[in-house]
Amino acid sequence: MDFLLGNPFSSPVGQRIEKATDGSLQSEDWALNMEICDIINETEEGPKDALRAVKKRIVGNKNFHEVMLALTVLETCVKNCGHRFHVLVASQDFVESVLVRTILPKNNPPTIVHDKVLNLIQSWADAFRSSPDLTGVVTIYEDLRRKGLEFPMTDLDMLSPIHTPQRTVFNSETQSGQDSVGTDSSQQEDSGQHAAPLPAPPILSGDTPIAPTPEQIGKLRSELEMVSGNVRVMSEMLTELVPTQAEPADLELLQELNRTCRAMQQRVLELIPQIANEQLTEELLIVNDNLNNVFLRHERFERFRTGQTTKAPSEAEPAADLIDMGPDPAATGNLSSQLAGMNLGSSSVRAGLQSLEASGRLEDEFDMFALTRGSSLADQRKEVKYEAPQATDGLAGALDARQQSTGAIPVTQACLMEDIEQWLSTDVGNDAEEPKGVTSEEFDKFLEERAKAADRLPNLSSPSAEGPPGPPSGPAPRKKTQEKDDDMLFAL
């Protein structure tokens, strides 16, 4: 039959296929391949002539480089041509006599040719499975699988390229049916019957991957670049902004970016299972990971910001304490009441708190007492006149003047000794009874008695050089002590 039809390469499309599959070519001539597709779509005999030329180049050819170029031309035509060409290519006769015959063991094809043929059969079987008039390749595919032939799984993403051209094929097929109306009305009915089941493949597009065209790939990558730009801007804003100090305009922009990226992620998640291009799928997964990371950062940002704002009203009362880092004078006084409110009713805790409070007050009182004591001693040293004991007249006159100015009552030496003994016994008793601490009143009394003892003791040894102790030596220390007591009471 082929002999009667003449040389397959003599037709316009055959000549171009011969050039496109020449073994001298280093790689595919895509411009020539697309020209072949245009001739097939535009001429009436284009599909048949092209298929005859491809069959001539593949069958029995030992130059497997030319065979690979012919398979590439065939694949390109299936992706870009219409239903008329698909009917011829998917026929059981062409698949079995051309493709399956090429990979027979007796021909000893290289692995690259073997895998290429199996990929074409598998992709066409999956693409044309829903079309009743294109099931010849499906039958061959199922027979090969039942015989145990393993199809390569790494190139399964090549299954989908046929779906995208089929969406445009419907219009071309409808147009071809309209062109044939004038020739035969029965052909119009047949074309209408064939056009009815053709919309079935788009229904399967949601279940099977889609191979985008180069224009769609470029548009998708530009949109992915836009998504990546939004992610970068949002990430930089989250890095620069402080949650508690962010401006309302910045927060509004951040929320807008978040909403935009959320919408973009939904589209990315829809495209991931639908795209058959492995490289595009990888890019979509990377973009999705970046979106998830920036969403996590935004959630932490919002959680910290809203957490600070919700805690602000409850912390409004101690705001002054947070600002004033100095010591709180009321902290010691309120410590016992705070611990009492916490039901810490231990006696040791209360005793410790009382000692802390008493020690604070005693320290202040002791400082005041030391100041008044120093000033009173200095004044007394300036006013007292020291004279020899022989000058009884001068001493008696000084004592009389001292008594008149202060109104003090002189006491005897025996009374002084009794007071000292009483103070010592009281001190020992208090130490034995109250080991936990002393109060402010006891400490004042202690200081007063010690002051009295310090003033009295030096005067006991002063008259030993001149005779027995007499009344003149006692009243002077007593008067000084009385004045110091008055000064201390005035200071307190």
Swiss-Prot record:
Effect on the protein upon substituting L285 to R/S: Reduced interaction with UBC/ubiquitin
Record region (Clathrin box): 321-326
Phenotype upon changing L257A? Reduced interaction with TOLLIP
Q: Name one Pfam family in it.
A: GAT
VHS domain location: 20-152
The source's domain of life comes to: Eukaryota
Which CDD domains does its entry note?
GAT_TOM1 (cd14236), VHS_Tom1 (cd16995)
**Keywords assigned:** Acetylation, Cytoplasm, Disease variant, Endosome, Isopeptide bond, Membrane, Phosphoprotein, Protein transport, Transport, Ubl conjugation
A single Gene Ontology CC annotation of this entry is: early endosome membrane
Q: Where is this cross-link: Glycyl lysine isopeptide (Lys-Gly) (interchain with G-Cter in SUMO2)?
A: K385
Location of the region described as Interaction with MYO6 in the Swiss-Prot/TrEMBL record: 392-463
Quaternary assembly: Found in a complex with TOLLIP; interacts (via GAT domain) with TOLLIP (via N-terminus); the interactions leads to TOM1-recruitment to endosomes and inhibition of TOLLIP binding to PtdIns(3)P. Interacts (via GAT domain and the C-terminal part of the VHS domain) with UBC/ubiquitin. Interacts (via clathrin box and C-terminus) with clathrin heavy chain. Interacts with MYO6. Interacts with TAX1BP1; CALCOCO2/NDP52 and OPTN; the interaction is indirect and is mediated by MYO6, which acts as a bridge between TOM1 and the three autophagy receptors.
What is the protein name for this chain? Target of Myb1 membrane trafficking protein
Q: Write down the species.
A: Homo sapiens
Q: Gene name on record?
A: TOM1
